Each structure stands twice: as structure tokens, then as C-alpha cells.
């Protein structure tokens, strides 16, 4: 079991971009999105093997989890020996292969 989680250098920007987009229509939903994202990070730190592996995206060590209440947003993460690394948070409609390869 991992002892916590860490964010990659991409996560802050991913979360802010998504929250700004959501805020245009519903400021309360944007706050709820950020809370749900961080709740997901904590959940994954306690249950790192639950996400689905997505080797089809070219990253065999990356797992994917949907954010509760915002199921179109995906958390991409890696299970490390002592923690979970939250790698990206992206909308599922994006070209995931191209975005993750950048």
C-alpha cells in the first residue's frame, strides 16, 4: 500500500485549465471539481491498483481513474513503491495519445 501521493509538474496546470472551463458555466461546479479531483488523489493513494491500465496510450505503467461527479475527467497516475504519482488530469474527449506524448 502506498503512503501518499505526489503531483507531477503538469497537474496544477491541468486542474486550473479544467476549473476555468467549468467555471464559465458554473462557478460552484468548478470548486466541486477541484475538491473531487483531490478526493480522487487521496482515494488512489489508498487504493493504487484500482485504476485501469492504459498500455494502448503507449505508457504501460500508467493507470486511469475517472473523477467522481466529473466522469469525463480522467486522472492518469503511476503506482510507485511508496506512493502514487498523479501524472495528468485531462478531459476524456481530448486526443489523449497526442496530449500525453507531448
Where in this protein do the model-derived segments appear?
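Basic, Lys/Arg-enriched alpha-helical interface segments
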Residues: 1-62, 97, 101
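Enriched for short, Lys/Arg-rich terminal
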Residues: 67-102
Amino acid at each position: 500500500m502506498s503512503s501518499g501521493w505526489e503531483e507531477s509538474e503538469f497537474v496544477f496546470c491541468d486542474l486550473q485549465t479544467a476549473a476555468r472551463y467549468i467555471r464559465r458555466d458554473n462557478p460552484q461546479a468548478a470548486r466541486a471539481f477541484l475538491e473531487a479531483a483531490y478526493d480522487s488523489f487521496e482515494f488512489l493513494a489508498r487504493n493504487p491498483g484500482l485504476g485501469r491500465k492504459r498500455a494502448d496510450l503507449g505508457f504501460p505503467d500508467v493507470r486511469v481513474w475517472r473523477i467522481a461527479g466529473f466522469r469525463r475527467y480522467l486522472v492518469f497516475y503511476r503506482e510507485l513503491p511508496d506512493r502514487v504519482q498523479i501524472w495528468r488530469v485531462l478531459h476524456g474527449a481530448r486526443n489523449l495519445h497526442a496530449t500525453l506524448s507531448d
